[in-house]
Amino acid sequence: MQPKYDYDAIIIGSGPGGEGAAMGLTKRGARVAIIERYDNVGGGCTHWGTIPSKALRQAVSRIIEINQSPLHGNTRLPHTGFSDILCHADQVINQQTHMRQGFYERNHCQIFTGEASFVDEHQVQIHYGDNTTETLSAENIVIACGSRPYQPQDVDFDHPRIYDSDSILDLKHDPHHVIIYGAGVIGCEYASIFRGMNVKVDLINTRDRLLAFLDQEMSDALSYHFWENGVVIRHNEEYEEIKGLDDGVEVRFRSGKRMKADCLLYANGRTGNTDTLKLDKVELEADSRGLIKVNSMYQTAARHIYAVGDVIGYPSLASAAYDQGRIAAQVIIKGQANVQLIENIPTGIYTIPEISSVGKTEQELTAMKVPYEVGRAQFKHLARAQIVGMNVGSLKLLFHRETKQILGIHCFGERAAEIIHIGQAIMEQKGEGNTIEYFVNTTFNYPTMAEAYRVAALNGLNRLF
């Protein structure tokens, strides 16, 4: 009997969300087509977001480490330009693309390279680069088309000195001074990268403190570290006009201030890539930022059409997007999912040094009137940190005074995003498995950064009476 549809599922986008859905479906025998608008798979995560920015950060971090190491005396590395370290990022991108292409090929996912748009509830049209089209049909459709940097209409992003977080990866000159408008995660990460290359950085924050969703101590630590390293932060500022010049960019603010720099990176928000999908054909609509509303099983208002990843908004993390795609695949196959996204998703912010956290902040616990206590460990007191010259950083554990249950973990310092997982694993244990006493009663390798958990746990338990 001829199948009713060409495929069991069409997935629009090949980033982490699309990949998670595709692997979850093909492993269960489903026929899957993937429509990717760009020539290579991987989505924004691989080509413009997570992978290249973290590769840049790694290169800059190593340059800083070598230049500051006492082992090298007064020897410093020769000046390395932005375009030079981009070569390292390109190598990583190529490796990631090749690997992910292999995933799809081995699992018999058919990839179509073109722009997708809905024809009706079960049909999607592909617009190819040669102006031809093809229409595919499927019983289920997964929208995993990601997001792009938000571009306000009154800013000329065609000007060669005005960039967003995608186009900054094509920076051809070596700026001496950069203005970064937007002090969210992306803005702070690039502030670290540029300052690490001895570029003068003005970081414009439209709010009253950096990364307000973080525990305030972590936010304050980042602000202090930026200040100590020469990043100038301007809080509560909004632009009146951003004007491209022959040799740079001038910004006029509503407060009356004016600034000029070699270039400007606009990093103030993102918008979903839904404007070309023709969602009206399936009676769906996106909000003002291009985001699609879904239920707990990632179904849209049309129950056989799913959406995962950045296109549904929070938490907008590559790690979460992959799991969302995997959960959507389960729902498509079984009608329900036997797993769900964990409640406490760790955040990793790849500034120099890193910040990572999972669970509640002190401010949240205080507002909830939870009787908690705090345990702290300073990296500079740990043997491993002293060996590698890691003088900056701390680990902070929040736990219930009576049950000893871990409620939140916050880390500031090199490799924070790796260190956080030790605590996360214990925090996710059920019942009595989640206890701060685990870190006191367990033997870790020594000397390692895991020692921070023992020190912080003892520090916190010693506060109890």
Curated annotation (Swiss-Prot):
Keyword Glycosyltransferase, does the record have it? Answer: no
The record, for SUPFAM superfamilies, names: FAD/NAD(P)-binding domain, FAD/NAD-linked reductases, dimerisation (C-terminal) domain
Which UniProt keywords are given for this protein, alphabetically ordered? Cytoplasm, FAD, Flavoprotein, NAD, NADP, Oxidoreductase
What is the documented function of this protein? Conversion of NADPH, generated by peripheral catabolic pathways, to NADH, which can enter the respiratory chain for energy generation.
Q: Name one GO biological process term.
A: 2-oxoglutarate metabolic process
Top EC class of this enzyme: oxidoreductase
Molecular function as annotated in GO: dihydrolipoyl dehydrogenase (NADH) activity; flavin adenine dinucleotide binding; NAD(P)+ transhydrogenase (Si-specific) activity
- List the Pfam families: Pyr_redox_2, Pyr_redox_dim
For the keyword Flavoprotein, the answer is yes
EC annotation from Swiss-Prot or TrEMBL: 1.6.1.1
Residues annotated as binding FAD: 36-45
Protein localization:
Cytoplasm
According to its UniProt record, which reaction does this protein catalyse?
NAD(+) + NADPH = NADH + NADP(+)
Sorted alphabetically, which InterPro entries does this protein's record hold? Answer: Class-I_Pyr_Nuc-Dis_Oxidored, FAD/NAD-bd_sf, FAD/NAD-binding_dom, FAD/NAD-linked_Rdtase_dimer_sf, Pyr_nuc-diS_OxRdtase, Pyr_nucl-diS_OxRdtase_dimer, STH_gammaproteobact
- Its recorded name reads Soluble pyridine nucleotide transhydrogenase
Necessary cofactors: FAD
Q: Which HAMAP family match?
A: SthA
**Cellular component GO terms, alphabetically?**
cytosol
Give me the comment on cofactor binding: Binds 1 FAD per subunit.
